Swiss-Prot record:
Record protein name field: Inter-alpha-trypsin inhibitor heavy chain H5
Signal peptide: 1-17
Domain VWFA intervals: 295-478
UniProt-annotated glycosylation sites, renumbered to this chain: N97, N127, N136, N231, N508, N776, N795, N862
One example GO MF annotation: serine-type endopeptidase inhibitor activity
Pfam families: ITI_HC_C, VIT, VWA
Family in the record: Belongs to the ITIH family.
Localization per record: Secreted
Keywords: Glycoprotein, Protease inhibitor, Secreted, Serine protease inhibitor, Signal
Species this protein is from: Mus musculus
Family annotation (SMART domains): VIT, VWA
GO CC, one annotated term: extracellular region
Predominant cellular place of this UniProt entry's protein: secreted
UniProt record, GO biological process: hyaluronan metabolic process; uterus development
Amino acid sequence: MLLLLGLCLGLPLFSESQEEARSWDDTSEQVVLRVPRQLRLLQRLKTKPLMAEFSVKSTIISRYAFTTVSCRMLNRASEDQEAEFQMQIPESAFITNFTMLIGDSVYRGEITQKDKKSSESVKDKRNRTSDDNEENGSDMFKASLVIPSKDKAAFFLSYEELLQRRLGKYEHSISVRPQQLVGRLTVEVDILERSGITSLEVLPLHNSRKKGSGKAEGDVGPPPSTLINQNETFAKVIFKPTVVQQAKIAQNGILGDFIVRYDVEREQNIGDIQVLNGYFVHYFAPKNLPPLPKNVVFVLDISASMVGAKLQQTREALVTILNDLRPQDRFNIIGFSNRIKMWKDHLLPVTPDNIRNGKIYMYHLSPTGGTDINGALQAAIKLLNNYVAQNDIEDRSVSLIIFLTDGKPTFGETNTLKILSNTKEATRGQICIFTVGIGDDVDFKLLEKLSLENCGLTRRVHEEDKAGAQLIGFYDEIRTPLLSDIRIDYPPDVVEHATKTLFPNYFNGSEIVIAGKMVDKKFDQLHVEVTASNSKKFVILKRDIPVEFRKMGNDVSVTPGSARDGGKDLNHIERLWSYLTVKELLSSWRQSNSEQEKEQLRQKAQDLALNYHFLTPFTSMKLRKPGLRTNQLEDTYGMSAATGPATVVQNLREAGKQPEPDLKKTYDPRIKISKTSVDGDPHFVVDFPLSKLTVCFNIDGEPGDILRLVSDHLNSGVTVNGELIGAPAPPNGHKKQRTYFRTITILINRPERSYLEITPSRVILDGGDRLVLPCNQSVVVGSRGLEVSVSANANITVVIQGNIAFVILIHLYKNPAPFQRDHLGFYIANSRGLSDNCHGLLGQFLNQDAKLVGAPEEYGKNLSNQPFPRAEGMPEAILKVKGRRVPVVWKQRKIYNGQAQVDCWFDRNNAAKLIDGVYKDYLASHPFDTESALGLSTPRKPETDRPHEESV
């Protein structure tokens, strides 16, 4: 697939990009220090942008793989430079999302109906490139843009595929070809198979067609720096080579294919059937059955273009294949150019003499003349039809043609449509044709359609890629047919739609996969019936599968990354069903010769692809610049998450799925709003839930003061500082000035250091990569156990490691009065992760208790802090906190933008005696100061020179 996207944009990537670029420079210089001296000159000579990070994350759930590629680039040059992102993806995969970051904009790929006139469309051409690094069975995705000087850009690509079982194993291949050495290179593969993982191996890097390949002859075992963790149903594989390790593999950054191969535990009988939320998948792969006899004709191109290594390697491969034929098989050999050279006029049994004579015949075939593909196929089909018609075959057998060519039809019938129709008419659905295209000049589309229409498979073999070995490998996939005429039935009153259920053959080591959509979710079981032929008998298998509609521990829900689908949850089985259905519609469309039928198939495939965000030949991808509007920005920035539509995979080991933020509300619905907060000028509220008491106080600070609100740096690693801004006091007020929080800084040093700097207009998140988010657009981002949810112009919710949560309220004024300032409020929503030693103006009360020890009779039931006051100006009560007696009065105070009202005991004395120490003890030297908030072993006396004014 060649997907070429060119954007010449000259926007700054983020605000303060010069400073960020310098920080990236520092990182890249550290990378250079780790590179061997002989490689430094090579890096200096590069004129293309530096790739700072290349990350691939694959999550495989019951053979269905979600893969996301993330790439970050930096232009260190003094002029604009073009950056190209390219990624080989499996030929069978569907792209589901592509996103680019440049300037302050996020360019998201939107799957739309195919519009040939649109110049912005990214088309699914399904054409292979001529690039040197193109591998068999893969397509190339390319995108390019111009990065301004000293700026950076990022690319994010997501795709999905169903892994096919070949030779008894599933193989997941990831292209690791960043084209340069990368400071941070990571490949991570998670495998979840509820039936159990029986074998798992990581192969050496495979890159046979590239000069820079690090795969040496005799390489065995996984690549260096590969880590494998596995239990019965789950496996995690991580490949994280250093720059030095990359250089030893390939100095040009073309490392090759990272391949994970595995198999699963399977039932001997009906197969593995999984049901989830109205959809099912059926994996059928029987074993330990006697093989069916084969009737096979080898058809070999001996035209002039096959001279040399191609013909020699093909002969050697066929010698190996002939040696592998079983005694019950029948075979023949045809060589063709512009003449059809048939070894014998009938099929021969497999005997030592016949095998020897067949080899001799092959070696006497000499290349000459043109290419009569139609004539060769008709001769082979006639041999097989005659054998079946003339022999009373007791054993059921499978008729196969293995057809090898390196070119296009040049002699006899050359019209491809006529060749296809002639072949289909002659085979009558009874003969399977397996085609092999050798070299780059072959008419691969013709071979592909020949196999597609005649129950076969096709392979492309590059002549410089050990063609003989590839041919033998292809034959190994079909050498052992176990069943024929397979039919799998499900009750029509239960299953609304199922993918293909009729299969001509089943070969040992492969797998039949059927997915279906059920009529109704309210039933207890799914009846499955399999009928097939095996040698001398029919095989009938029946079973009722219990259906439990629940969130199973080994099932994983997948959440689309687009608001267009209304936020509905799509499970992996539903996506597998849609994937197979689209594939089958495309296959039927290619085979159809009726324009009306083709249009109907095209429309069905297009509608399904649009619904599930698949890039197909009937859909296109348009890049839109909507700004940061959706609540799925973690799909763009989250390097460790599977990103893009339909690839945000939830916790692989837990059954529950966390709800997503509802941006229509003014706060994250997962977060319960707490009374413990500081807001306004600044008004502090502290909740003591055990005592059913709420205490409030004011701090009259100075503009520029930085207050320590939460200090738990040595334990949980969290510190929160707030910087004050000044404003004139309102007319006739009792205060000389007001102060508000203009900046809240949250610092985290576990598990890795990161910080958040929040103002009413923006959020700066530095979790390894610096990210600037505007507060006027709703987004959700995640990094290193930190989740930040911005609800536009309303609030920011910060969740740390799942057990600490803060809500920062945004106060904005359209037409502010002189005494008003845009400012922030800070609320502690979840403090479970903070330690008992937590301190700060708010933090010191989180694990404390308070008690009213003396109050006048006028308060009555107000000791429980529930009733309303009888009147204002009530006398003082005494509150006991940490052994200190604090005079307080009862008051009502509004919090959370006036949406809630709390009854609290108010300390009028600027928190004297209530807090440990005095106000100055809570002043930080700068916003990123993490020193202990208070170094006192005993309380100090309150300051006497601070104003003790009450402000409400």
